[in-house]
Regions:
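Hydrophobic transmembrane helix segments
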Residues: 18-63, 67
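Interfacial non-cytosolic loop connecting adjacent transmembrane helices
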Residues: 33-51, 93-120
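Loop-to-transmembrane helix junctions at the membrane interface
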Residues: 59-95
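Alpha-helical membrane-associated segments of multi-pass integral membrane proteins
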Residues: 107-149
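Cytosolic juxtamembrane helix and N-cap/initiation of the first transmembrane helix
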Residues: 1-23, 137-141, 155-156, 160
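Alpha-helical membrane-anchoring segments
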Residues: 8-19, 43-50, 84-86, 112-116
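Aromatic-anchored segments of alpha-helical transmembrane domains
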Residues: 19-29, 88-100
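Cytoplasmic membrane-interface segments at the C-terminal ends of transmembrane helices
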Residues: 3, 65-80, 131-150
Length: 161
């Protein structure tokens, strides 16, 4: 399953947009703005709302689609621990910006802000490291397989001459 069909793209897009569409209003229901928290000036809201609410919701929706549809690929083989960890990491990297930005919006005081940032930033760094190791491992395995194929071709051509 290396290529996505039109139906696959439609499934992914539907889940992404559907979840994002639900996440935007849920942002304000689940994370109610506490009274007295500083609010941004009205002049920057047209820029702030897409960055702080819509884009994280779309990323969250894509993360949900990735988890829903990507898990079948993980189940297909006996995945390594690194493959599973990468799957979880990618899911987290895609979904975490929605709660992260909402916790920022409602955090009261520097202590709460520090806790939010330590938790989210640390887990993003860990997840990114896992994905980087996975990527390098896959590239090395492919390079090794390519070398084996070249060696086999060289042996085959040498034996025919």
């Amino acid at each position: 399953m290396n290529e996505l069909t039109r139906a696959d793209w439609l499934k992914w897009a539907s889940v992404t947009v559907g979840v994002a569409g639900a996440a935007v209003p849920l942002s304000f229901l689940l994370w109610r703005t506490p009274p007295g928290v500083a609010t941004p000036p009205a002049s920057i809201l047209p820029v702030l709302i897409p960055i702080a609410v819509v884009i994280p919701a779309l990323s969250f929706g894509l993360g949900v689609a990735f988890i829903l549809f990507g898990r079948n690929l993980i189940r297909a083989d006996r995945p390594s621990v690194l493959s599973r960890a990468s799957f979880v990491s990618i899911g987290w990297l895609l979904t975490n910006s929605w709660p992260h930005s909402n916790f920022h919006r409602v955090s009261e005081g520097w202590a709460n802000l520090v806790v939010v940032d330590y938790f989210f930033h640390t887990t993003v760094i860990i997840g990114s490291c896992i994905v980087a190791v996975f990527f390098l491992t896959v590239i090395r395995e492919r390079r090794g397989a390519a070398q084996i194929n070249r060696s086999a071709r060289d042996l085959a051509s040498a034996s025919t001459t």
